[in-house]
C-alpha cells in the first residue's frame, strides 16, 4: 500500500466519524495532512486516532501554539487568535497527521488521551496563556513571571524594559515562590500511616546532569513518588528565532543541544529548504551525514562514560574523553569548531572538506572499533554494572510511546523505529547499517543500544569516506548563494538582489514546513512558519529530552535513590535540550 493510500485510509475514517467538525484541510506541502478541527471534536478526534482507528496514532510527538495576531499570509485558514497544533505519528502506518484548532485563548485538553500532553499544554499555557480548562502551573518560566513570552505583544529584548533592580521585597517574594508544597500538587505525605521524607534532588546535584530538580517522596531509601521541575535552563530560543534572520538563527540551533553540534542544525535547515524548494547537492548531503554521525559518536561516548560513572565505575569516562578528543580534533579541522560549529547552511554546508580530511577520518575509523571492544569488556560485561542495570528502570513499547519516548529509549524496548531507516533523509537510504534494538527496555538495554549505535555510525562514516562524491557543497540557488560577480557587474537587478540579501537578509516564501531527523537522543523536529519575510514568524522546536523527562514519575516509584541516579543517567538528556 502506498503512502497516499495509507494516509487516505486514516483521513476517510476521520471524515466518516467527525464530518462537519473537520473544518478544512490546509495545503502546506508538508508531506502529511494538516486538518483544522472544531473545538467540540478536539479531544474526541485525538481519542479516536489513538484508541479506536485501525493502525492508530499512539505517539503525540508535539503540541504547540501559534500567535496569529500579526500574521499576514494565512489565506484559507479559519480565523484564529491563537492556533493550537498537535502532531501525531502512527508507527504502523509510518505516517504523520497534524491537527489544528482555532482558539480565542481557550482550548480543550487532550491530557486525558495522551499522557505526555500534560507538559505540552502547560508549556502552551506558560508561553501563550492558553486556558485548557484545568489547573495548569507554569512550566518553564518562574511562577512570578508576568505575561506570556511567545505572544507577539511580549517584549523580546531586555532593553525594552526598565533596568532590573533586585530589592529586598522582590528577593523575598522570589524566594517564597520557590517553595513547593507537595499537598498542593496532590502528592501524598503519608504511606501506611508513616510520614514520607520530602527531598529536593537538585537543581544543583551532579547526578541530575544539569540544573534540574526532582522533588522526591521517600520511604527510607525507596522512592514513593517523584515530581520533576524544569525551566532553570530556559533561554527563550523560540523567541530568539523570531528576531534572527533565517541564516542568523543557525548558530542558535547548536545551543539547543550543546552536545549535538551540527545535528540540531539539520532539521531546521530541512524545514527551510522544503519551504524554499531547494535541492541540496549530493556532496553536501554526504558531508552532512558524516558530520552528524561523528557528533552522534561524540554524544554517545559522553553518555557511555558518565553512565558507568553514575553506577560507580570511575575509569571508563577518562578513556572515553580521550577518544572524544580525537573526534573533536577532526571536527575542528573540518568545521572550525569543536562543539558549536554552525557549519551547515541553507542549501548545503559552509565550505568544502579540508585537504587531508580523509586521512584523519581513516585513522579514527581504524582506532575506534578496538576501543569500543575494550569499553564493552570494562562496562557491559562487568558483573557490577549488570547487577545495577539489568531489570532496573524497565518499560515496554506502549509505555514509551504513551510518554513520547523516541530514539534509543524507544528502541531499547525492541521497537524498530529509526527515521534514518523509516523515512530516510539526506541520502541515508544509500547507506548499509543496522538499527540496534534491546529487549527489556531497562537501563542495561538503553546503554547497550547506544554502544552498538556507535559501531553503526562508524560504518556509515566509512561509507562516506569511501564514496564521497565530487561536486558543489552548496545549492546554486539565489536564496543560498551570491550570484556570479560578472552578473552583478552587468545587471542592476542582480546587484540589488544581492545587496538586499546580504544586508536585509534572505526572504523565505510564506508558508509552513517541518524538518524531522533521528537525532542522537531521538526525534528532533523543527516546525517553522514564514510570513514571507527575512525572519521566522514562528519556530517550534520539538526536542526528545523534553518528552523523556516527563516520563520519570511513571518509572521511578519503587526504586531506591541509587537506582534513580542510574535511571536518570540512562535517559541521556541535557537541560538545554529540555528547556530550550
From Swiss-Prot:
State the membrane topology. Peripheral membrane protein
Using the UniProt record, give the first listed, main subcellular location: membrane
The reply on keyword Transport is yes
Keywords attached to this entry: Cell inner membrane, Cell membrane, Membrane, Multifunctional enzyme, NAD, Quinone, Translocase, Transport, Ubiquinone
Question: Which GO MF terms does the UniProt record name?
Answer: NAD binding; NADH dehydrogenase (ubiquinone) activity; NADH:ubiquinone reductase (non-electrogenic) activity; quinone binding
Q: Where is the segment annotated NADH dehydrogenase I subunit C? A: 1-171
Q: What's this protein's function?
A: NDH-1 shuttles electrons from NADH, via FMN and iron-sulfur (Fe-S) centers, to quinones in the respiratory chain. The immediate electron acceptor for the enzyme in this species is believed to be ubiquinone. Couples the redox reaction to proton translocation (for every two electrons transferred, four hydrogen ions are translocated across the cytoplasmic membrane), and thus conserves the redox energy in a proton gradient.
Q: What is this protein called?
A: NADH-quinone oxidoreductase subunit C/D
- Higher taxonomy: Bacteria, Pseudomonadati, Pseudomonadota, Alphaproteobacteria, Rhodobacterales
Gene from which this protein is expressed:
nuoC
